[in-house]
Amino acid sequence: MKLSIIIVNYRAWAHIAKALDALQAGFPDDWEVIIVDNESEPEAFAEFGSRYPWVRLIANPANSGFGFGCVIGVREAAGEQLLFMNPDVVATTGEIRALMAEKAEDPDVALISPRQVGTDGKPQKVFDEFPDLVNQSKTLKALRRLVWPSRKPDPRAEHRELVYCDWVTGAFLLIDRADYDRIGGWSADYWMYVEDADLCKRATDLGLKVAYAPGVEVIHAHGGSSRINVAVKSMTKLEVIISKHVYAHNHAGGVTRGLMHVLIGGLRLPGLLLAAALDLLTLRRIPTLRVRSGILTGLLAYYRGVARTGSWLSPRARANQS
């Protein structure tokens, strides 16, 4: 088997249908699609299976998040290469072949991701620099880029050639199975978000390259699974913050680690507290304020858990490891 395409689903069947319809034309015999259905609902699962019999479906009774869902998919994958693809991405087999060709140009490239545009045609950020002490603040990050523009490639700029960068998004990520195994695969420490930066960090620590291919383009309807309602939006945005703490714990050291933890929380708590107060004053009628109030409630509970257990992992990630 040449390629295994792995998609982790959370109640995004409508998006996946568009993705599979785009792939189905000319789909090679030596490729496979594996869908891991988190918190699987039997009726929808069965209906989709009958509609797309050429796809391998795995019912996961728990909502295990993105990274661990990918791990479940990899266990069943037979491909020499692995393509991790969000359910809200639309790509053709031709675009996938083009990305495979770009990767083949440099044998040292372990992970590669293409240009991604929204349904409105606007380009999305696909790569960036590894989290550090400075870039916890958007202002300081922008100032550093202003005074030292050559330090790292700019993810907002238009690029024509292959870009070697720190990390690329896991929304559409191609990697050889051998490199995936060498790196150690997706970390179960992250329930959702930042796991792609972690994977790329461990790759670069081994001397492997990470690349962005602007010559290949796919469509990404960003947030197709993570913004379906206020509760899910609060939960996923909370997990972004938690995953930043996990990354700091795993990859920073000494004083830097402590300062990163302080900044991750300290830069967010004042705004969340203000939003929660406004949420109460407006009788919880404004969805945006309800989302931020939910983030605050979850974040404070998380910090209490950190103080109690000494672990920075999300409770959801700990559940995956139990």
Model segments located where?
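Short, flexible, basic/aromatic active-site loop/helix in glycosyltransferases
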Residues: P131-C165
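Glycine-rich, basic loop-to-helix element that forms the pyrophosphate-binding segment
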Residues: A59-A77
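Short aromatic/hydrophobic "clamp" motif used to bind/position activated sugar donors
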Residues: L82
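Active-site-adjacent helix/loop segment of glycosyltransferases
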Residues: D205-R284, V291
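A short, conserved alpha-helix in the catalytic core of glycosyltransferases
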Residues: E158-R160, D166-E217
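A conserved acidic beta->alpha catalytic loop
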Residues: A22, D37-F45, A62
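Conserved donor NDP-sugar-binding/catalytic core segment of glycosyltransferases
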Residues: V90-F127
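Short, acidic, metal-binding catalytic loop of nucleotide-sugar glycosyltransferases
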Residues: D21-D30
